[in-house]
Amino acid sequence: MRTNLLILSLLVLFTTNMHSQSSAWFSSSSEAKAYAQKNNVPILLVFAGSDWCKPCMMLKAEILHSKEFEQYYPSQFALLYLDFPMQSKNKLSPELTKQNELLAEKYNKSGFFPNMVLIDVQGKILGTLTYKHQTPEVFINECKSLIEKTKIKE
């Protein structure tokens, strides 16, 4: 009985966690844009190399998948995760690869990874964020500050 309760609890926790990760986390630019328009929020483009870029892996593990960030971001922006994997086992679909390359040409000309760019639904750059091995709380405060600055400009 105790084992069944533990398994059920873990299943509920896992399902809830997966839901929170997927609520505003996208790999498709059209889906991210639709979410942003519907919720009147900007889009955070996250350029990452999931299988070769150590800082990208750390950003994802320490910030993007942190409980604090997962609770914060869905009401603040759509997160568009633009992956550039190197290993063939992680290869993206041709459509996703093309989408990511086109967005990188426009918003990540320097080729810096990880790179985070906040844009509005029309594609106008509102600002950038940098991962500096900070805590989720510090990163969230940087997000809040950037979003506040964009509201002042409007």
Give, region by region, the residue ranges found by the protein language model:
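Thiol-based oxidoreductase modules, predominantly thioredoxin-like and allied folds used
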Residues: 23-26, 69-98
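A short beta-strand-turn-helix
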Residues: 26-43, 73
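Short active-site neighborhood of thiol/selenol oxidoreductases, capturing the structured segment around
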Residues: 39-53
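Typically the conserved alpha-helix immediately C-terminal to a functionally engaged Cys/Sec
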Residues: 56-72
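Non-catalytic, surface beta->alpha helical segment in thiol-disulfide oxidoreductase systems
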Residues: 62-64, 102-106, 110-152
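C-type cytochrome heme c attachment motif
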Residues: 51-55, 114-117
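Bacterial Sec-dependent N-terminal signal peptides
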Residues: 1-23
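Hydrophobic beta-strand anchors of alpha/beta hydrolase catalytic cores
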Residues: 44-45, 79, 116
